[in-house]
Amino acid sequence: YQDLLRVSVASPGNDHRLGANEAPPAIISMFLGDELTELLNSIASGQHHDNAERVKMTVGADIIPFIRKDNTDRNRTSPFTGNKFEFRMLGSASSISDTNVMLNTMVADTFAVFADRLETAGDTEAEVKNIIKETVKAHKRIIFNGDGYDESWVKEAEKRGLYNLKTTPDALAGRAAAA
């Protein structure tokens, strides 16, 4: 649905803003943080996940308590960040209503597929694991825990088959070509 999400925020002003200093790039990605990414990769590979302790930072002063290392997107370069939903592709002057309709439709469509599978499953718990495994394998290319402003991300995203629809005409043509 990456092309539809981009179309949902298409405007001349947003074309100028996306990928600039104050906004994420026009590439749809999801920042999960290392901890959650490792958990999902473990499920997808069928391996046991070692729930390691959170990393603590050392700040070099004895009087300051240990500070847990933040595993969220500190640069806020991803439309979906950490343990919260923060859709940043939309410009501040725009209404999020169209984008919400599209997002909710995408989620509902996906949940309907999951529900159909679970309703007919003999072993629901095993089917949940299968759904997670298949979903992670099919969509892990959108997970990016790095700096979305770095030029290397644009090249990596292209290798992963992610769109970088920088302009409204690109977004509309990308959707038309995919339809």
Q: Positions of the model-derived regions?
A:
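Acidic, glycine-enriched catalytic cores built around paired aspartates
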Residues: 1-179
